[in-house]
């Protein structure tokens, strides 16, 4: 691929794959998975690079960072390419999709705060949703704690209405992420956490009972020391606010 063609497909200038590098050895099925998920595509939707060119793009641009410390970039890139082509080491998915691109986002996991605010705060519910959507477009996944949100049905003084609650906003997030393809290749991975002492914890634990609901999240309960002491003492652990 020439530099002009690379730029057209959102790829930073990358030297050609050295001719003496070996081809990657994969089954045809594995090769098709790599092509389907990770190679860059042109405007027509067809692959704009081979699997070997994709590996070299990743290897070269990861190695290029070490030029700052006087490393021989081409030699280091060759080392990395051999690790990839021999299946000795694979990076995370965002590295395959993001290395050597104009954005260059390589991180797989982000943890975002959610404040009990509809959007005026920098970490308000919908500001965080916006940030998370942008992260997922670059191939990253997100983790959230919904523990600061007030319980469902609580009074909202500013509007004299009732609070939606953590599970309600979890559904809002889930619906939004259902429309976003992570990195243009797959749906985003998300983790929702709620503290065990939140008044809505039982609804939260049961929110995925219907397997057709909240399909873009895994959920986890945040366990506290007080809860574990109550378990050991075989006594009730009251929820916060009750």
Residue ranges and their predicted role:
Residues 1-242:
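Extended catalytic cores of very large enzyme megasubunits
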């Amino acid at each position: 691929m020439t530099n002009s063609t690379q730029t057209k497909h959102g790829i930073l200038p990358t030297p050609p794959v050295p001719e003496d590098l070996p081809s990657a050895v994969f089954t045809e099925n594995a090769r098709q998975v790599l092509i389907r998920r990770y190679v860059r595509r042109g405007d027509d939707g067809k692959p704009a690079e081979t699997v070997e060119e994709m590996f070299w793009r990743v290897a070269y641009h990861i190695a290029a960072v070490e030029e700052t410390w006087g490393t021989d970039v081409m030699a280091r890139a060759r080392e990395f390419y051999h690790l990839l082509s021999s299946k000795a080491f694979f990076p995370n998915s965002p590295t395959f999709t993001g290395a050597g691109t104009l954005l260059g986002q390589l991180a797989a996991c982000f943890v975002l705060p959610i404040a009990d605010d509809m959007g005026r705060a920098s970490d308000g519910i919908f500001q965080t949703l916006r940030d998370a959507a942008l992260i997922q477009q670059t191939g990253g996944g997100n983790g959230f704690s919904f523990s600061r949100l007030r319980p469902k049905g609580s009074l909202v003084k500013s509007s004299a209405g009732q609070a939606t609650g953590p599970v309600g906003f979890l559904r809002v997030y889930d619906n939004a992420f259902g429309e976003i393809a992570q990195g243009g290749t797959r749906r985003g991975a998300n983790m929702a956490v709620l503290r065990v002492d939140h008044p809505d914890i039982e609804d939260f634990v049961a929110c995925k009972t219907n397997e057709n609901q909240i399909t873009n999240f895994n959920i986890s309960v945040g366990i506290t020391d007080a809860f574990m002491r109550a378990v050991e003492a075989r006594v009730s652990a009251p929820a916060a606010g009750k």
